[in-house]
């Protein structure tokens, strides 16, 4: 199943009678509750959440033509945790420059990236799959560290 981000936020708040302070993303508890609801109502361990706020997505995420405040992007949640993030990328040079500038970033810093757009970047998308996250959920681990051979955090950078 899939659900828009704004609808998912409202659904979790309404069904579980909970208020969450984070407006541009899910809090971990919201992801768990949304997955619990989807599992109960559809039987699926997976749910695609689409149309995240533009302010929360990277500069290369394409804004929706219908509503530029949201992006043509998604997260795939699995058993209460985000395991994949992806979406359509901006392929138009002018649109990409405008988005970089609107974020207060310096266009010059992205010249090598923008070169591809100037030459005619085709429509494209991408995603990132968190294999450790997926493995942790698949095996029922509460902590992703248990699914990583060499876990890293703010206190550990080398094995």
Q: PLM ranges: what are they?
A:
Residues 87-88, 93-159:
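Active-site pocket scaffolds in enzymes
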Residues 1-79, 103-115, 119-121:
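Metal-assisted phosphate- and nucleotidyl-transfer catalytic regions
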Residues 49-50, 77, 84, 148-150:
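Residues in well-ordered beta-strands of folded domains
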Residues 10, 52-57, 64-66, 81-83, ...:
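Short, glycine-/Ser/Thr-/acidic-enriched flexible segments
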